[in-house]
From Swiss-Prot:
Keywords: Chloroplast, Plastid, Ribonucleoprotein, Ribosomal protein. Belongs to the universal ribosomal protein uL2 family. It is found in: Plastid, Chloroplast. Pfam families: Ribosomal_L2 (PF00181), Ribosomal_L2_C (PF03947). One of its GO terms (biological process) is translation. One of its GO terms (molecular function) is transferase activity. Part of the 50S ribosomal subunit. GO terms for cellular component: chloroplast; large ribosomal subunit. Residues 223-277 are annotated as: Disordered. The lineage of its organism: Eukaryota, Viridiplantae, Streptophyta, Embryophyta, Marchantiophyta. This is Large ribosomal subunit protein uL2c.
Length: 277
């Protein structure tokens, strides 16, 4: 993924960088694979803010991505590599031999007219999907299922990759991008390779307007709000929060308090927690 740097001909471009989009094909998305996306703007069905700092943004069409990869034993060809406004990575349009078309996540290194397949005995090549039990140790994978047949739920962000580090019985041990080491059933499917756009974390937005295009609004500190708006608000002048511990706008513990449930069913499958938890 190449990065384009701007000259400082305006304050907004002084530190701005964007992808060069060398890999993608300029084309319209498939109509049958798109539908309108309702932007919730951080509100629930009653209009109450449940997630702050969201709203606005450019209109988007949602591209339906094939996370299940359940079209087995039929080869498909990479027709296009397209931009997707709903995620940081690109997507690929697959033309299958029977005429069906589907979108998949863009694996790093795949090229136009390459062939992919999903089956139990698929070769270990980039873009192919097969069960974890048929993959050798050390294989780099993405779009990993947690429950067999449910579709990929892990390792779908730009530049991410997981590795198979052990097999024992009916379980496979994976090292996830977060540093977590987790057990997954050998029957689960995964796709070979790393997700594209590995340098997405090196991009610099450059100006506040670019954040607004993405639907992200300014963040206001709770300590400068009124007491009705935030538990940290109020006071005369610059005052401390006035509480023993920091709280969220809804009064729950914040800044370091773990929100994961105790005795969750998957605790026995997590051998090591992620690095930042």
């Amino acid at each position: 993924m190449a990065i384009r740097l701007y000259r400082a001909y305006t304050p907004g471009t002084r530190n701005r960088s964007v992808p060069k989009f060398d890999e993608i094909v300029k084309c319209q998305p498939q109509k049958k694979l798109t539908y309108n996306k309702h932007i919730k703007k951080g509100r629930n069905n009653r209009g109450i803010i449940t997630s702050q700092h969201r709203g606005g943004g450019h209109k988007r069409l949602y591209r339906k991505i094939d996370f299940q990869r359940n079209k087995k034993y039929i080869t498909g060809k990479i027709k296009t590599i397209e931009y997707d406004p709903n995620r940081n990575t690109y997507i690929c349009l697959i033309n299958y031999e029977d005429g069906e078309k589907r979108y998949i996540l863009y694996p790093r290194g795949i090229k136009l007219d390459d062939t992919i397949i999903s089956s139990e005995e698929a070769p270990i090549l980039i873009g192919n999907t097969l069960p974890l039990t048929n993959m050798p140790l050390g294989t780099a994978i993405h779009n990993i299922e947690i429950t067999p047949g449910k579709g990929g739920q892990l390792v779908r962000a730009a530049g991410t990759v997981a590795k198979i580090i052990a097999k024992e019985g009916q379980l496979v041990t994976l090292r996830l991008p977060s540093g977590e080491i987790r057990l997954i059933s050998q029957k689960c499917l995964a796709t070979i390779g790393q997700i594209g756009n590995v340098d997405v974390n090196n991009l610099r937005i450059g100006k506040a307007g670019s954040k607004r295009w993405l639907g992200k609004r300014p963040k206001v500190r709770g300590v400068v709000m009124n007491p009705i708006d935030h538990p940290h608000g109020g006071g005369e002048g610059r005052a401390p929060i006035g509480r023993k511990k920091p709280l969220t706008p809804w009064g729950h513990p914040a800044l370091g308090k773990r929100s994961r449930k105790n005795n969750k069913y998957s605790d026995t499958l997590i051998l090591r927690r992620r690095k930042n938890s």
